[in-house]
């Protein structure tokens, strides 16, 4: 996520206890096993990859995985930093929201853009959320 957004979290007293970033932690959640056919091993690992909107999975376990992480790490809330125009993640968000609300997990949705340099709207939303918590 853009560093400016991380600074806004810090300024408002947030501590990030876990993340589920598609190009970060999610990539390291499981190892690709050693195999003579490296491409086949990579394909099998991708086929068995749970909790990623980019990987087709009719069971949609991502919401429960995040809820489990909230409990494991004692998080007060979940902040969904949605990368603009990431259709697979945007498509799954209503499912996540429904699961968060059913589990009583407080949550905030913000849109971010890697190219953005202005974060005033995001800052206002995070400040308001901090006051609610």
Give the predicted meaning of each segment.
Residues 23, 84, 112-116:
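Short beta-alpha junction loops
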